[in-house]
């Protein structure tokens, strides 16, 4: 077995074990203290279960997508040193086109409008 296969097997096994333990441990002893909200050692002043803004979530996801896009396209100037620079340019153009189409769709659907 080569090194990469061993690392992948260890990663998958460790992930499965940790996911199983994380779902299993909280169910052992649920009590009122574990289920109550915690605000820096003080009793909560209001409702601790406030609704979360879906628009804020969508804008945060868009920010993460475009931040990831920058991270993926940052090494693009060094892509011309590869064996097929045209293929590198084509893939980066495809990524940019896909993200641009997604942004246009989100804009036309009104997902970027903060106030209605």
Curated annotation (Swiss-Prot):
Keywords: Electron transport, Membrane, Mitochondrion, NAD, Respiratory chain, Translocase, Transmembrane, Transmembrane helix, Transport, Ubiquinone. Its main location: mitochondrion. It catalyses: a ubiquinone + NADH + 5 H(+)(in) = a ubiquinol + NAD(+) + 4 H(+)(out). It is an enzyme of class 7 (translocase). Pfam families: Oxidored_q4. Its EC number is 7.1.1.2. Belongs to the complex I subunit 3 family. Core subunit of the mitochondrial membrane respiratory chain NADH dehydrogenase (Complex I) that is believed to belong to the minimal assembly required for catalysis. Complex I functions in the transfer of electrons from NADH to the respiratory chain. The immediate electron acceptor for the enzyme is believed to be ubiquinone. This is NADH-ubiquinone oxidoreductase chain 3. The gene is MT-ND3.
């Amino acid at each position: 077995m080569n090194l990469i296969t061993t690392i992948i097997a260890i990663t998958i096994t460790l992930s499965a074990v940790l996911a199983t333990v994380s779902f299993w441990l909280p169910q052992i002893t649920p009590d009122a203290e574990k289920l109550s909200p915690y605000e820096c050692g003080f009793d909560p002043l209001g409702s601790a279960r406030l609704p979360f803004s879906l628009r804020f979530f969508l804008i945060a996801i868009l920010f993460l997508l475009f931040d990831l896009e920058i991270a993926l396209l940052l090494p693009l100037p060094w892509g011309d040193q590869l064996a097929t620079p045209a293929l590198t340019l084509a893939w980066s153009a495809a990524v940019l086109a896909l993200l641009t189409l997604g942004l246009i769709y989100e804009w036309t659907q009104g997902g970027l409008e903060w106030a209605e």
